[in-house]
UniProtKB/Swiss-Prot annotation:
ATP 2 binds at residues 639-646. This is UvrABC system protein A. It is found in: Cytoplasm. Residues 1-232, 315-593, 604-935 form the ABC transporter domain.
Amino acid sequence: MQSKSIKIQGARTHNLKDIDIDIPKNKLVVLTGLSGSGKSSLAFDTIYAEGQRRYVESLSSYARQFLGQMDKPDVDVIEGLSPAISIDQKTTSKNPRSTVGTVTEIYDYLRLLYARVGRPTCPNHGIEISSQTVQQMVDRILEYPERTKLQILAPVVSGRKGEHVKILENLKQEGYVRIRVDNEMREVTDDIQLEKNKKHSIEVVIDRIVVKDGVASRLSDSIETALKLGEGNIIVDVIGEEELTFSENHACPICGFSIGELEPRLFSFNSPFGACPSCDGLGTKLEVDIDLVIPDWEKTLNENAIAPWEPISSQYYPQLLKSVCNHFGIDMDIPVKEIPQQQMDIILQGSGKEKIKFEYENDFGSIRRSEAPFEGVLKNVARRYRETSSDFIRETLEKYMAQKNCPTCKGHRLKKEALAVLINGKHISNVTDYSIVESIQLFQQLDLTEKEQQIARLILKEIDNRLEFLNNVGLDYLTLSRTAGTLSGGEAQRIRLATQIGSALTGVLYVLDEPSIGLHQRDNDRLIDTLKRMRDLDNTLIVVEHDEDTMLAADWLVDIGPGAGEHGGEIVASDTPQNVMKNEQSLTGKYLSGKEFIPLPTKRRKPNKRKIEVMGASENNLKNVSAKIPIGLMTVVTGVSGSGKSTLVNEIVYKSLAKSLYKGKVKPGKHKKIKGIEHIDKVIDIDQSPIGRTPRSNPATYTGVFDDIRDVFAQTNEAKVRGYKKGRFSFNVKGGRCEACRGDGILKIEMHFLPDVYVPCEVCHGARYNRETLEVKYKGKNISEVLELRIEEALEFFSAIPKIKRKLQTVYDVGLGYIRLGQPATTLSGGEAQRVKLASELHKRSTGKSFYILDEPTTGLHVDDIRRLLSVLQRIADNGDSVLIIEHNLDVIKSADHIIDLGPEGGDRGGQIIATGTPEQIAEQQDVSYTGKYLSPVLDRDKQRMEETLEAKTVSRS
């Protein structure tokens, strides 16, 4: 009998404390809890990992070696598991060949559609290319009314230069009488002189016919003769009316442009049969970018305005440039922007064939003279990039290059033959450039013949279904041609969700990781409906989620806690959402029921005169937007998914500030101007990328506190007696570390058909250091034991050393008291990594001129974590520094001093600023702002809660 639940006993993965739990099957189950409490350990590292492992175990050992090994999770028993599919945010392809269309398989169906009902059309003449039989040609001609006069012509020369004497002579010998030369009727016996260097057309008159009964067989004979002479092409000249062209070849009857047999691979940009030969189907080419070559047009040539020719290791290029400027009389002491265009063209594009006398003196004083044309800066960079075999030089030159649309295919990725196949006047790449919403309308309004409809019916059904699913998960603004690498984690996850629904599997266990990331409240209901639809197909959904709406919509809610890290890993509540709300032990329940909440700020900071002003932003879908970001405030940029928030903040504001402050080689998105940079001296982008990619990186090394701890150990009497400096206490360099494991503390043993086994080092037993180093102790602990301390314990341990205490205090303040000093960076979640970065910035002295940028910082955070994060961000703003956040979370939005709301919709229908002001001002603009619509009830609710809390406190005091 099929079990009704997934039974887990004795789960101990990571921080899970030997837990037992029953998870109901065929239900929407939400796992929640503080960041680091063990949600992912239970969902992904235990349940999914075991489901996946059991499937792989069923394969032969030969097949298993190709699949990579699955570790067996640390759990006693899991019963009732179904085949498991995980949809997380990390596994999206960054391959430039991957697009929304290919990931969702819609593009595969589109290729099939174009191969079956597409109409090849000559790109030069706009004529539909089709091969016809003689019978079809006769039938078409006989459609004309009786007494219609026409003549049948065989084209022997079509738009070719020459005198064509031989051809005319042959026609005379073969007995033909009339010909048409360049649209003029002539006799073959005439003296026809053609100009050698002009293009000519010659057609032979095969027959003159009047349409009447019984003419069909004569017409048929004449057409056959004409086809033979015209190599498969004929022209029917209807006297006084139109001209018809027929072809029995699959080619344009005028210019001969032909397409082979239509097959799906012709439309694939990942196949040599369909890909543009110039860019190999990528649609873009790496070209030298003038804005990166000359980043600052205010500089002069003598001030090294040309970045790739800066004299870093040699004076060769500056001397070459000087010779060019001397030859053409170019002033090297005026700003580059003032150099006349003609002279600038010589510097950038070269001198053509004109030779220049060039003199070069090397570092040893010897002089070399030569005379040669000047190739130009842009061609020089491109040539060196092409010809070098050095990875270092290639990487250096890449900084001056950018991806630009391929000039051959104009960014469409396909060869011209594929782009010549049309349906309703559009080629396949035109269709993929439509947004999902526009595509749905396009396919509903396709104008197909009855035969084409029959062929395309099933293909269109599949395409419509998949487009509808994408629309339902709030991705209506994406285009099918969008590359997968440019999608946010939430978008990529929802695309894969839509693909899974399209497959309509049943009896599957889906494990999802925060599918609501990057989704505006407006689209949340659609996502929840999608999840319920998957559940209704008899699937079990285990969703790791912090979103209130999703938790309340769940059939079953599991709260893991009570704290995070060492303080978590237990099941606090496992029940229906309604019962969890009544559970006094559950922190999540308290927030859901409103007993706990994030209060509104008692007062909001007022903007002063200082601001960063972006003018004329028009990158991606931004429509010439001008935005003002006040300095010293907490500003939140809001708007529905795809409205242009990331483009404005990450592509324009961050890159412009980084380029200006750090002379970075990044190219900001399109905008006219940015003002107010003088108000800041550093810009910090705090994202959720890992703080280090190896286990050697940890919170202690990242925040810099490990340096101070090593100083403390080096100052101990024992260390001084032994002559140990601080380097002795590093596990990254020889000296103090254990050389058997090179300071890793563990050894990896490869077990080909089984998972790799990691065992503690036999010499140091996981301590990372050699015996002599471990003999040095501070307050009874050696350096290895100190790295094992949790942040909260380390705070107590180093309370007498202000320098260390200050750095650790900030890590504790952002809610990471539970992580260990030496915890490998690879084991930290995205939210934890982001907070370590925040903490390492916080302990630095504030100048009031720092500008912090955070893109969806609430990802992976519980409401209680968000509360802590907000108090840290408010602290930054209290110091006079500026905070700019992209966010959908209403708790963050309601805490802002200033909001910039983009919209009104996503994609092409977005890209405008529709409202700015305080949260209260945005809430009043519900008619134009979706954010205002959802923010208004939250503000009212929290004001009421704050009043009730105040009353309760007053009553309890009295």
